[in-house]
């Protein structure tokens, strides 16, 4: 009987279940979207119960569509939208409030208060993170402060907190396991990534009782088993967990110090494996945990690009310049260059290394000769310029010279972007055969724990290159183009509209 790993990929807009065979090939995929809630401007929430039912639905669908029985599942791996926060009653398993999503800015006031108290360096030095609404800790505090009766229930030990991985393990196991893994813990703003434990001082500052916290485990071990009535009569081990970007790093077999992957999704996320050393950043990068495996923890530097693939959606849906994302490649290749046009897509501010929340998008270099093709090409090029910004920050902070870049995400299908990226970085850009690297990473972690795969070496040998893009631009042109981008970003940061 052939066995498979079931990977649950719980994302920001949809839940997916993907079956992988022993070769790391995809046997089947199922996907289901769920509702987004926007109670106030800048707030984003999900219904944690709807996330759970969507996961149940896609698990059933992928088994059914693939004609695979539950008894053929060797283990389950989970990868998840990071930082999104659920607080639930441990007796009823009912959430006491919506899940507050990573994008949500509703804890801006809490973060501002903490900064004004001079606490930013304390949080940074213990967690590797910035004091930002992005991370989970302030979301927990917000729920306890704003939901009636929550603070009292928490103090009585009746409430549990978890990121989405914890919530799904709790539900799949029928409440037998309240756990998370190192990667998700490292995104909470209350986990000390150096001591590898929840930080009591930070918990006290945010007034979070430690009875709420999940136990932190390795990214690959048997945490619990499914209860049979949640998994079609079978008790299957749940044995791999990683936050989505760390899972992609693992799925790309970036196991060595200095290995880098960039995900071109809605936003862009670059991670560099820094080995067993946690590198502090002076360039606006985050220090985080890459994975915990074999009794050791690997660290990573992470850079965030707020607008990546969503810039192409903007061309399609906002400006209606193109009918489909693939069309952008065709338009970009019709012209030799942008003729000096730069698009800075700072629609929601600038991420790494600028961290300018008040910057807004801008276009520079327009002339009467500017045509649609130049504009589209400049928008695609902006993804690559932002990637170079982050990579240069990583090389500076780590002291590591990067030799190549592994890529994944929706925009990597665009050959123009990949070639321009190689030209701009003067590096080989490696596109893998399997683009589902996030789900694959979770599957690998789950499979290693139960002997489905033997070692990281075996996994590294399974990584297959679909295409490598080699640089084909002279240095003078490369540096002239990048210098123009830096001037465009600088001008964008100067232009600020004051609030009325």
From Swiss-Prot:
Residues binding glycerol, per UniProt: 82-83, 134, 244-245
Free-text description of this protein's post-translational modifications in UniProt: The phosphoenolpyruvate-dependent sugar phosphotransferase system (PTS), including enzyme I, and histidine-containing protein (HPr) are required for the phosphorylation, which leads to the activation of the enzyme.
Binding residue positions for sn-glycerol 3-phosphate: 12, 82-83, 134, 244
Keywords associated with the record: ATP-binding, Glycerol metabolism, Kinase, Nucleotide-binding, Phosphoprotein, Transferase
Disulfide-bond pairs as recorded: none
GO molecular function: ATP binding; glycerol kinase activity
ATP-binding is among the record's keywords: yes
Binding residue positions for ADP: 12, 16, 266, 309, 410, 414
PROSITE patterns in the record: FGGY_KINASES_2
E.C. numbers: 2.7.1.30
Means of activity regulation: Activated by phosphorylation and inhibited by fructose 1,6-bisphosphate (FBP).
Pfam families with a match to the protein in the record: FGGY_C (PF02782), FGGY_N (PF00370)
InterPro entries documented for this protein: ATPase_NBD, Carb_kinase_FGGY, Carb_kinase_FGGY_CS, FGGY_C, FGGY_N, Glycerol_kin
Function (record text): Key enzyme in the regulation of glycerol uptake and metabolism. Catalyzes the phosphorylation of glycerol to yield sn-glycerol 3-phosphate.
NCBIfam families noted in UniProt: glycerol_kin, PRK00047.1
Subunit structure: Homotetramer and homodimer (in equilibrium).
Name of protein: Glycerol kinase
Gene coding for it: glpK
């Amino acid at each position: 009987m052939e066995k498979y790993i079931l990977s649950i990929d719980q994302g920001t807009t949809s839940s997916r279940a993907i079956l992988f065979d022993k070769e790391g090939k995809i046997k089947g995929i199922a996907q289901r979207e769920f509702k987004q809630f926007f109670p106030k401007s800048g707030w984003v929430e999900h219904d944690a119960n709807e996330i759970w039912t969507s996961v149940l639905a896609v698990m059933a669908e992928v088994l059914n569509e693939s004609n695979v029985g539950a008894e053929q599942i060797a283990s389950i791996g989970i990868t998840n939208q990071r930082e999104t926060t659920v607080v639930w009653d441990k007796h009823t398993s009912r959430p006491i409030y919506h899940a507050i999503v990573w994008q949500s800015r509703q804890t801006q006031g809490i973060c501002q208060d903490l900064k004004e108290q001079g606490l930013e360096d304390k949080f940074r030095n213990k967690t590797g993170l910035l004091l930002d609404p992005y991370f989970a800790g302030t979301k927990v505090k917000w729920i306890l402060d704003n939901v009636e009766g929550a603070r009292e229930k928490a103090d009585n030990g009746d409430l549990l907190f978890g990121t989405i991985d914890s919530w799904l393990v709790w539900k799949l196991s029928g409440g037998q396991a309240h756990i998370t893994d190192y990667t998700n813990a490292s995104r909470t703003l209350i986990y000390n990534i150096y001591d590898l434990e929840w930080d009591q001082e930070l918990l006290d500052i945010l007034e979070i009782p430690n009875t709420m916290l999940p136990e932190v485990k390795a990214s690959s071990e048997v945490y619990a088993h499914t209860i049979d009535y949640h998994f079609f009569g079978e008790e299957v081990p749940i044995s791999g967990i990683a936050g989505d970007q760390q899972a992609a790093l693992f799925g790309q077999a970036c196991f060595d110090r200095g290995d880098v992957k960039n995900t071109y999704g809605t936003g862009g996320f670059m991670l560099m494996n820094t080995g067993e050393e946690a590198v502090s950043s002076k360039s606006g990068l985050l220090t985080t945990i890459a994975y915990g495996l074999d009794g050791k923890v690997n660290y990573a530097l992470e850079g965030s690009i707020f607008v990546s693939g969503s810039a192409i959606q903007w061309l399609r849906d906002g400006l209606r310049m193109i009918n489909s994302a693939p069309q952008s490649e065709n338009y970009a290749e019709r012209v030799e260059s942008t003729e000096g046009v730069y698009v800075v897509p700072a629609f929601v501010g600038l991420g790494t290394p600028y961290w300018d929340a008040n910057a807004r998008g801008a276009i520079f270099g327009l002339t009467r000769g500017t045509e649609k093709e130049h504009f589209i090409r400049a928008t695609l090029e902006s993804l690559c310029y932002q990637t170079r910004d982050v990579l240069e920050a990583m090389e500076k902070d780590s002291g590591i010279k990067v030799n190549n870049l592994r890529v994944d995400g929706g925009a990597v299908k665009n050959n123009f972007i990949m070639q321009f990226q190689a030209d701009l970085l003067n590096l080989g850009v490696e596109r893998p055969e399997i683009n589902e690297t996030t789900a694959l990473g979770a599957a690998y972690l789950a499979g290693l724990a139960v002997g489905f795969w033997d070692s990281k070496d075996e996994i590294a040998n399974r990584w297959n290159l679909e295409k490598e893009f080699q640089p084909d631009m002279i240095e003078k042109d490369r540096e002239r183009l990048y210098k123009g981008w830096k001037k465009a970003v600088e001008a964008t940061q100067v232009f600020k509209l004051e609030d009325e």
